[in-house]
Amino acid sequence: MGLSTLEQKLTEIISAPVEALGYELVGIEFIRGRQSTLRIYIDSDDGITVDACADVSHQVSAVLDVEDPITVAYNLEVSSPGLERPMFTAEHYTRYLGEEVTLVLRMAMQNRRKWQGIIKAVDGEMITVTVDGKDEVFALSNIQKANLVPHF
């Protein structure tokens, strides 16, 4: 997924303290608005607890206070990826080959911005998704948002 310059900088700043605590930084989202939000997704092989989120929040807050990359007031949220796991990198798509995903594109393809299908292949920065029996290829940089579709 094509990250903004701010999101790239935040990822660089945040990854070290998250990994130092023994967690994987799955990705981040910075949502601008009346009350902006910095959402950080973390994971580990043992799962994520509320205490883990609190520890990461505390460490990341300290680093962000020093680095100060965000010029507006914001809320910090730390959570596990959950069932509708967000996808941020080519590695995420590779890890979930064969799974169903929902994509929201930055720029429409075939007059559509929202797509849903099965992740078929990953080739560098290109993702192939089978939608209604037809393979569609998406540039990672054109994917605004992507989430796994949970099945129960």
UniProtKB/Swiss-Prot annotation:
UniProt keyword annotation of Cytoplasm present: yes
CDD domains for the chain: YlxS_C (cd01734)
GO BP terms: ribosomal small subunit assembly; translation
UniProt key word Cytoplasm: yes
Entry-linked Pfam families: DUF150_C, RimP_N
A GO cellular component annotation in the UniProt record: cytosol
Subcellular compartments: Cytoplasm
The entry's keywords: Cytoplasm, Ribosome biogenesis
Top-rank taxon: Bacteria
Major subcellular site: cytoplasm
InterPro entries (UniProt xref): Ribosome_maturation_RimP, RimP_C, RimP_C_sf, RimP_N, RimP_N_sf
Gene3D superfamilies in the cross-refs: Ribosome maturation factor RimP, C-terminal domain (2.30.30.180), RimP-like superfamily, N-terminal (3.30.300.70)
Function, as annotated: Required for maturation of 30S ribosomal subunits.
Family: Belongs to the RimP family.
Protein name per Swiss-Prot or TrEMBL: Ribosome maturation factor RimP
Organism annotation: Yersinia enterocolitica serotype O:8 / biotype 1B (strain NCTC 13174 / 8081)
